[in-house]
């Protein structure tokens, strides 16, 4: 065997200078209308870099655990901060979610009004210390917090609200990927360097390089140009350089046959390699490795009514009111988040005009879709509800193994269950992808999560992911921006529906995406649920696996047999605890089964199994509990109709709801209305204020349904080893 190394796709200096020409050629080839309507106008646009030094004039807001310290800052006091002796400083809030930065109802704004909103949902203990407009009036230019800032939703309204309130710099111990990228795309600076605090307060001119240190070459230039859109215009004008992807291939001799073999790669790396653009603007390179940066062409781009209107406004403002998107056939819009908002929004919020604003989101998306010729999965014609949640429909009808998909939602990794790389992006990434059909990517490291052995009968994928979320490796932020690759015998036994629960909740881990290597179960899914020819489906998954010598940043191993039903206690999905570890019975008032995570066919099997068991024993949903079951899509509703589940749900006392994100986004039946109200939900996150003011526990469909019958949180015992006693 003879081996030598050869560099493929090496650009060199000439390659660096032709990147803009390649992008222009590719766009012009994709759509002739771009020649006149978009590209020429952008090529004439004047684009300049921001100054190479930054001087901030204003105050610093420390987001502390102590609400009184925050109130004192809002009243005008500048909090002392000892950068040399951090132990002397008050504790900063960790795990600040985008739900806290911009609570869902205020995301109905998509203009500078958001500057009145930042941190309205921030909870310090039981107190929300920041009122509307107080950050903006306080003259703050920098906000400081602890670990995992910006976790949760991909909503770009959060950094946009901060920016409109005057915040120019965000400092935290570590920062979630999507939130950080949204900040960079908008021009908000981010850092994990706490020594900047004294320098900002001292009015020092800080080199911009302090904020680009450690970033890849593309991100550095995005920051230097003040955001993604000006960077992309500069990219078309040949003013920027893209780093070469230097793929090393080995020449192997097998008899008389010479071939170049790519180095070992993970499944995700293989898919990235298929989609990265080379120096000629062509799609695909021989291999990639973690840290490689560039642009990847997306097979599918989608967004929903929370994001599409803001992206459309940006597109019309910066590109042109009459400009057309690039390849409308690969873009999909969804009306899924706010379908039932009118049933739960408070009178106070109605008086603020928020319901009217939410309706405008719907109309703006409809109008933009019609104008651009983009497919919109909207509301039902004959009854209230949506066609389905975006993630549910994308898995049921669109995503394919080996694809690279991007969506305006943090739970876009849902479809990784059939072996595609799918990840969430923010508004600016969305509208830029409408121009370029690609997305900037830094190839992430992968974490291999092996779940060995055989699971218990009452344990589900949701219990697995809640266990993973409770691990120190995840809670400390070490998994941030990495691919979660799930494998092992217990994963292989899971259906595609169950696997999607785990890939979906890679978002709660803070991962880049989640993925499972496609196998016979993925093929069966494509054949049985999509009607695809089996040979075609089988050929589609060829080569989609991680190589034996692929490199991982970390490996997590769990024994499925040791995992029992779990809950995440209120406040964070990482607060995992076994149900049997709850010290006292926890009565519940609301049980909720639904959302993209738990509104699938197999989730309905679980709700129906528990309720059918209860009916056999003469029991129903406890009188003290309201149990809501919401379908993820019309396909799942039809499945329940065929299986006879609707009758079971009705007889057992559950309330059935047509598809929508609903309670998970504080916009439908199942939300809490009082701080002391206890909810058990099969949704994916329970950040403060996410689904109302109450105390939310996360659990599996089995546990949610069993608790609805019992009246308090219990494990489901399929063999009736334990009698459910109504509270």
Question: Model-flagged regions — what are they?
Answer:
Residues 1-7, 12-727:
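Fe-S-dependent hydro-lyases/dehydratases of central metabolism
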